[in-house]
Swiss-Prot record:
GO terms for biological process: chemotaxis. Contains a C-terminal catalytic domain, and an N-terminal region which modulates catalytic activity. Phosphorylated by CheA. Phosphorylation of the N-terminal regulatory domain activates the methylesterase activity. This is Protein-glutamate methylesterase/protein-glutamine glutaminase 1. It is an enzyme of class 3 (hydrolase). Its main location: cytoplasm. The active site is at residues 177, 203, 299. Belongs to the CheB family. It is found in: Cytoplasm. Its EC number is 3.1.1.61, 3.5.1.44. The keyword Oxidoreductase does not apply.
Amino acid sequence: MQKKIKVLCVDDSALIRSLMTEIINSQPDMEVCATAPDPLVARELIKQHNPDVLTLDVEMPRMDGLDFLEKLMRLRPMPVVMVSSLTERGSEITLRALELGAVDFVTKPRVGIRDGMLDYSEKLADKVRAASRARVRQNPQPHAAAAAAAHGHAGAAAPLINNPLVSTEKLIIVGASTGGTEAIREVLTPLPPDAPAVLIAQHMPPGFTRSFAQRLNGLCRISVKEAEHGERVLPGHAYIAPGHAHLLLARSGANYIAHLSDEPPVNRHRPSVDVLFRSAAQHAGKNALGVILTGMGRDGAAGLLEMKKAGAYTFAQDEASCVVFGMPREAIAMGGVDDVAPLSDMSRRIMARLASMGDRVQRV
């Protein structure tokens, strides 16, 4: 008999603790071993129960969730899924939690808490399941390294400056899910200001993508923004799919443009990585590079194969550096990947490949 995933739920709301327990205990492969109203109680329960996964509210009394997470990841690293409110402040705190080492997050519904949380049961269970298999990392000073890279002081970024690449024809197309917010940061921060345009589909709910883009914009040398429907796609810019819509690449004459769609979810996701990759295969062909990063499930695998068949060169993040090696594994298994790279070397390999394309970049 397979051992169940032990989950400790930390939330100052008794209702949320009860609902989380109900949802998790309804799954055949997991159970709540204990609940705690605040981090101080949780600290003792961690010692007592040795849970496999912690769900943690971001805002609690006695000790802030971020303070607790920072101490936890330094002293006793373990998989953590954050439980966040759908507010601007909540999104900023959640993104900071992901920087500190949380594996993923699930949002609290704004209204009808009980019905809303029960509707989230499948998503919550999936995230707990993925977290139990995730590689937990210690991340002592992410801001310092990223800020240095953004201002040209990081040693790893220097070689990229020597290869300025300005071309409206070249594009970098990126897809990610669980663990992707930090992976995307690591890919984008070394890019030079004149890098080709980057289009990104990251599985993230509405209300979080704008804060995510703003945070990256403050760390990167390229401009990062949430994509808007119909805007021209320009070099030196990264465009992140809004949490409520699919992002597609389209063309208007000789120009690339961003197209947003409210079509139904694909692979249970909107935005979907497959949708973005397929549009890049159709409209960019050999002019694009495809990059699939850490994530749960198979979204993006089929689309990356379509990009490769259309002439694009494709990358996948390697297993050792992934938080969850799901999407890259599926893409590799389908034969859609040309190069498997560690996250720490992904930007350099992308820029080296772009430099080698030269005159072979073609208008499609």
